[in-house]
């Protein structure tokens, strides 16, 4: 993640609303500690709230329609490093733990954040850009750009400003198809010490000590002595050496495993709201989002067409590791809500000529 001193950065989405003042992680021994972003701060006694999704507003931070006061929150990156609140940016995907959500008379929801975990999907060199298709390729993974993808200050031209060889950090969602949908892309203009890839393990070869994430071949031979529990179908966060081995495989320097893509809090009774893709589907009443089992049997009106590959927002309560839903909505990039930012703060000056 690129450090920064102020927020928000110049915006690259289609509109801005300005308002006036008003774990599921399984650790590999010897491969580091902590969760991917983490969910500390929600008690195991069944109190508090948890939400996971892109930052869509400031004035504190707005995630999934909830305004979280982040003044006292602990902010960490998915590698466990402490971050400043000023490092948070629009489009970054975060896991937020905090107090119970309250709803004002005008319908606005708010809570106090205790921890904010930031997680990106890919960090590495761009090997291809397809402007016509709206995609780029990073570490062998195809990344889809949408009209709502946010680009950082160094990429104000959007996808047209991205060049082959540039090292970028991609925030967003892994789709069941293996393609990544980008909610934000940062240009890593400072030298990096490693690359990073998050995805689902496949093609595990324990003899060769390799596996794949998408099309990328990863070798864990250098850290094999500390690796245990690796299996196909697991979610993995892999830090990679900057150069591949002689066979072309990317060399892992650390691996972190999880059963889900989102580091959900432990305990029952926590109110949770998550955004992601349906990764498994049994029926309208039972499916998984980012590996998290959802029980939607009590939802009065479900959107038609629920299926693997649909992006949804689910709100409910955690019980026995299952998210018992009380609402399920599609979350598509052509929704009007996704075309807007929300900024709240004190107006310090007004330019009549600029309007």
List where the protein language model places each region.
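Short, flexible, surface-exposed loop segments at domain boundaries
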Residues: 2-70, 78-355
